[in-house]
């Protein structure tokens, strides 16, 4: 664009329109200076960045992680590969009346890779990762939490992405427990209805360290329940090898 504009300015100068040519050059120089200060990637606003009230409910990231970055049990790895493959083929599956798995419940001890799994799926599928902020979702006012949850599910239908509910037992605990709270029960009822009615192309992931206290109705709403276990000695060694691959060492003993 700038080169074409400079050619126009030179042409006008040849025709004797010196003032016009000078004004064009000044405009080009000003545009170049403005572009150098505002055209950096750090100032670009992601097109899927939540706005308005959603900005307090969802945190968006664009992970680059891949499945090969994780050390997993074979059963877990196969389930994730199947999910990724089905998501890549979701249009073809829908043509045949089938639906890909897109509602996943991840259970297991802390530090076993549940949160990283959400990042890996987002990276493999090339879609944004939306973390649902439970601290903003849950409020003390009756009915407000369910209304905010509705906003989250509206976003699920409008923008394709990975929507991740971490520490899901905060809103998914069994109804009827001794410490049951009426407002959380209503939130759970709303969640059960919304996730069952959801027909979007987004992937919904919930993760918890305490599957034993989840409400039984939740397990029927998810397409797949993936159980993570603590790594064995072989997996720990493989993880350390991957992390230390860029370092030179002749004294590492992996056994």
Regions found by a protein language model. Give the residues of each.
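Short conserved motifs of the RecA-like P-loop NTPase core
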Residues: 61-65, 173, 249-255
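Alpha-helix N-cap and coil->helix boundary residues
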Residues: 19, 23, 163, 251-253
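Walker A/P-loop NTP-binding motif of AAA+ ATPase domains
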Residues: 75-79, 85-251
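AAA+ ATPase "lid" subdomain C-terminal helix
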Residues: 13-17, 246, 255
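AAA+ P-loop ATPase mechanoenzymes
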Residues: 1-85
């Amino acid at each position: 664009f700038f080169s074409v504009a400079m050619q126009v300015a030179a042409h006008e100068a040849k025709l004797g329109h010196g003032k016009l040519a000078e004004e064009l050059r000044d405009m080009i120089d000003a545009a170049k200076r403005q572009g150098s200060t505002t055209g950096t990637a750090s100032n670009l606003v992601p097109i899927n960045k939540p706005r308005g009230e959603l900005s307090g409910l969802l945190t968006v990231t664009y992970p680059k992680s891949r499945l090969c970055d994780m050390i997993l049990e074979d059963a877990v790895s196969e389930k994730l590969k199947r999910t990724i493959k089905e998501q890549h083929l979701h249009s073809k599956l829908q043509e045949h009346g089938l639906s890909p798995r897109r509602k996943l419940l991840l259970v297991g001890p802390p530090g076993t890779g549940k949160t990283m799994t959400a990042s890996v799926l987002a990276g493999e599928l090339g879609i944004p990762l939306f973390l649902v902020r439970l601290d903003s979702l849950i409020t003390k006012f009756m009915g407000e939490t369910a209304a905010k949850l509705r906003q989250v599910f509206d976003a699920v239908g409008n923008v394709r992405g990975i929507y991740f509910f971490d520490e899901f037992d905060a809103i998914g605990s069994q109804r009827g427990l001794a410490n049951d709270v009426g407002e959380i029960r209503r939130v759970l009822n709303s969640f059960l209805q919304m996730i069952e009615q959801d027909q979007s192309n987004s992937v919904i992931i919930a993760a918890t360290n305490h599957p034993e206290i989840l409400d039984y109705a939740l397990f029927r709403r998810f397409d797949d329940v993936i159980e993570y276990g603590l790594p064995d000695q072989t997996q720990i060694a493989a993880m350390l090898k991957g992390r230390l691959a860029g370092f030179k060492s002749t004294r590492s003993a992996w056994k």
